[in-house]
Amino acid sequence: MGNKIRTTVLLAAMTALMMIIGQMLGGRQGMMIALIFAGVMNFASYWYSDKIVLKMYQAREITPESAHGLYAIVQRLVQRANLPMPRIFIIPQDTPNAFATGRNPDHAVVAVTEGLLNLLDEQEITGVLAHELAHVKNRDILIGTIAATMAGAIMMLASMARWGAIFGGTRSSDDEGGSSVIGLIALSIIAPMAAMVIQMAISRSREYLADATGAAISGNPEGLASALEKLGTYSKQIPMRANPSTAHIFTVSPLSGTTLMNLFSTHPPLESRIARLRHGSDSGTGNRDSSIRRRNMNTEAKAAWDRLR
């Protein structure tokens, strides 16, 4: 499925979810208000979602003078990937992580945390940056930032549903299909989960491709594999202050590794990603299935490299 179609499907699904919440909160009038709100959010998501996410994490832009080493790495990678130079931001958090955002490669942004720069070596930083530039190259960034903005709006509406339940609902008794307090409570629980499932469906498959493309850009799969190991370890030791609606845009999920979060994880298992980078398989074993998956991974990486030229 092309990313244009994926974006359209995402916007339609998120809009439908908002309308359901609006209908539960205020009947037909609530549904129409939600539709208008969704239209505004769709417009804002396309033009301003990157700014919203950067503001959310208090990211600051760097220049070649203020962070020469980081700027030089990105500059080298974009030349290899045949991409325009993105704007680069640093997030004031100690947990190592990164994300890319923007509506297209000409308006792309790459953001890294202070922890990434402090805790990873140059090869690992290069691997992470190559992974994020792969998302830019594969045009994943628009759909990712739109999903983040829309999921945030849905979670806000779900919170309104929860308050509506607390105060006994907001609809009059003569509206068709009057919603109950129990319905509002259920909606306040289900809506955020539905938003996470949509995020998961959008982003999970793209992470493997970004890993393969990133390895092709950097020319060093081990750099990214080692970085993923460290990011996974440090994310547990130094929890990140992250909004769940933006979890899918990061290199690794910044959310706590609880069973529920793993169930609704927006990323594939780290072990699987690392094994694919190192061995071309999910297990790293030398059996026939592993050999087949290794050939598939090599084919995927070669295709990614062909797209760079």
From Swiss-Prot:
Cofactor: binding comment: Binds 1 zinc ion per subunit.
Key word Transcription present: no
Topology with respect to the bilayer: Multi-pass membrane protein
Entry keywords, A to Z: Cell inner membrane, Cell membrane, Hydrolase, Membrane, Metal-binding, Metalloprotease, Protease, Transmembrane, Transmembrane helix, Zinc
Biological process terms in GO annotation: proteolysis
Active site, per annotation: E132
EC number: 3.4.24.-
TM helices/strands, residue ranges: 7-27, 29-49, 141-161, 182-202
InterPro entries xrefs: HtpX_protease, Pept_M48_protease_HtpX, Peptidase_M48
Main location: membrane
GO molecular function, one term: metalloendopeptidase activity
Location of region: Disordered: 278-309
GO CC annotation terms, alphabetical: plasma membrane
Names of required cofactors: Zn(2+)
Compartments in which it is found: Cell inner membrane
Binding-site positions, Zn(2+): H131, H135, E207
Keyword match Transmembrane helix: yes
Similarity remark: Belongs to the peptidase M48B family.
NCBIfam families attached to this UniProt entry: PRK03001.1
Protein's name in the database: Protease HtpX homolog
Source organism of this protein record: Desulforapulum autotrophicum (strain ATCC 43914 / DSM 3382 / VKM B-1955 / HRM2) (Desulfobacterium autotrophicum)
Encoding gene, per UniProt annotation: htpX
